[in-house]
Swiss-Prot record:
The gene is rluC. Keywords: Isomerase, RNA-binding, rRNA processing. GO terms for biological process: enzyme-directed rRNA pseudouridine synthesis. The lineage of its organism: Bacteria, Pseudomonadati, Pseudomonadota, Gammaproteobacteria, Enterobacterales. This is Ribosomal large subunit pseudouridine synthase C. Its EC number is 5.4.99.24.
Amino acid sequence: MTNQFSSTHFLNITENSEKQRIDNFLRKTFKRLPFNLICKIIRTGQIRINKKRINQNYKLKLGDSVRIPPITIQSDSNKKIKLNTRLSIIFNNMILYEDNYFLILNKPSGMSVHSGSGINYGMIENLRILRPYNRYLDLVHRLDRDTSGVLIIAKKRSILRNLHEQLREKKIKKKYVALVHGVWPDILKSISKPLLKTSSRKNKNIVKIDPKGKESITHFNIKKKYTKNTLISITPITGRTHQIRVHLLHLNYPIVLDAKYGIKKLDYFIKNKFNINRLLLHAESINFFHPKRKKNILITAPLDYVFKTVLKNLI
């Protein structure tokens, strides 16, 4: 089947769309277009803003005129995404809180929050298709694919901007729980080590401790000690990529079943005893100021069955 956007047309940027990256704006506006095609037409200059070429990092300004060229795409009807009743039920069961401004979910481990790196549809893309009545849906923050827990989605652009401002000003408080290898010492309460994002052939994003990196601070509290493991509560003061996982590895208390920053030989016992392969890191709660209700909101996400089963049966 061939789908066509048959003629050149222009979009004028309003207040609801300003400050977005052009690639994200186009992905939300033209949901049928594959993201790699969006990147290509930007890169080749087919997308113009105010008659000028731009790159995909360009942030839209109020009043910008975006030129959209004619586009033809081939689609295989057998490969259409099937968002059936079962998937709708799965997403509905994730809901922790919802009002006219926010949708807050308990994200399962193993589910990507957005497309990219070989994933055509993440949670946010699926939600936009499942919920056409929500004119605007966007991620306030991100969680790693393997991390479970609280995920906030904004229903209005103005709400997204407000929450991003709260994040920048460190007014949003997040707490995580993790099962780590080793018996955690009572005196260890925090770590402050700079983190630098690098790349390698095997992994696109690898984060390491480096003096050239950004300031990164994480606080810890013990929840429960086991014979060879500890369940800890974690409060990241800064919000760097993979911050918790890298800091814990540096302290020699890696998270159980962390495929990227863990230690496989330590994971062997739990992996085989419980027949699991998920990172035991969970975004337990988030506390933020609701800009419309004018009060603080605390959202808590319960652990899933797998995580609870491991804790229940550990000695």
